[in-house]
From Swiss-Prot:
Keywords: Glycosyltransferase, Transferase. UDP-alpha-D-glucose binds at residues 22-23, 263, 268, 340, 366-370. This is Trehalose-6-phosphate synthase. Belongs to the glycosyltransferase 20 family. The record marks 86, 156 as: Involved in alpha anomer selectivity. Pathway: Glycan biosynthesis; trehalose biosynthesis. InterPro entries: Glyco_trans_20, Trehalose_OtsA. Probably involved in the osmoprotection via the biosynthesis of trehalose. Catalyzes the transfer of glucose from UDP-alpha-D-glucose (UDP-Glc) to D-glucose 6-phosphate (Glc-6-P) to form trehalose-6-phosphate. Acts with retention of the anomeric configuration of the UDP-sugar donor. D-glucose 6-phosphate binds at residues 10, 77, 131, 301.
Amino acid sequence: MGRLVVVSNRIAPPDDKKSSAGGLAVGILGALKTAGGLWFGWSGEVGNEDKPLQKVTRGNITWASFNLSEQDHEEYYSQFSNAVLWPAFHYRLDLVKFQRDSWEGYTRVNALLADKLLPLIEEDDILWIHDYHLLPFASELRKRGVNNRIGFFLHIPFPTPEIFTAIPPHEELLEGLCDYDLLGFQTENDRQAFLESVAGKTRLTTHNGKSHQAWGKTFDTEVYPIGIEPDEIAADASGPLPPKLAQLKNELKNVKNIFSVERLDYSKGLPERFQAYERLLEKYPQHHGKIRYTQIAPTSRGEVQAYQDIRHQLETEAGRINGRYGQLGWTPLYYLNQHFERKVLMKVFRYAEVGLVTPLRDGMNLVAKEYVAAQDPKDPGVLVLSQFAGAANELTSALLVNPYDSDDVANALDRALKMPLTERISRHAEMMKVIRENDINHWQETFIRDLKRTTPRSVESNLQKKIATFPKLA
């Protein structure tokens, strides 16, 4: 078997330290180091698009990156990927802004990237493509004669057929996805939603539950819940506190902490979370002066109106809640619209009695797993988790809540704040068992293993040709 070629919208810079890399980068680098190969993606730069591919090699891995023109970046990335696919796949059709030009830009850039990658592909390479920016990428490679094994992993949810078919070019997207040999999803619900969408548009046949045919194409589907590096997170969390954090911990020693961190995005349910916390203060006044909720939400896609709106809404809500319930010497809610280093966050997780993770819809949500892994197993905190996060399928010992029901979340927070040590230890141990079994290495190893087991298109094509030449029985 040849090299591994990874394609994603963005690549992690080759000289980034592991400590600053996110979970996806760690998983991809682990797979690349095992097989050797290439990581291909956008450099993050807009303009100077005629610049040759920028290549850097470290050991047995090569990074190859390209620039995008302003038009391509706007239509492919800002408009179609993030103003059509992202909201639709997160069940927010009210925020979808479809324009025919953006669809044309999306397909044009996928074709452009296929042209750029084509000369770099070797005969025995296997290709692993990532996420919603590149749904039609396999189709573009097939058009150019690439018969290598090509796998795809979707990091975000796949919506139900009723939602997906609202995207105007939904049929083209579905048929294009069937050009992959293996399609990986975060949850079984996502996998089934995809298959139901295909079955609604063409004849779908399934063999052994996971191998399918549609539009004359053969492909496999499977569930691969992405994981984390629990030992690395535990080490980061248990190290010495920086001076400012040590001082803050001392100041808060008589207060129980509820902690959340997510990038500022409408899919994360932040306004609903603030309302649920307010409901906790209203319904359980015994907690006044004894708890503090800290929400860290660094700005994301700040140029998009929907993101500007949610930022203003959160600032208003935080001020209103503090104005209503705050006391001299006690501010019930801290909202920080800024970025913190990942290592620092792991230390903060460890000293938070409650981790509050309540997205309205999420493919997985690694923050939930990171919070659990950062805890002291002898005195762990409690995870309050949305039932609509992919992580809820694995972390069943968390307190699962409906993020749309403020009373449900408030009741869970009250229960978490009062939970006895024995129950906290038991729930934490059960979640850690799952997190260790399905860590980031297990995720990438099982996906690559299954992709290698698929039948290459060239072999499949030759078999079909041979079958076609068999004499027909009279």
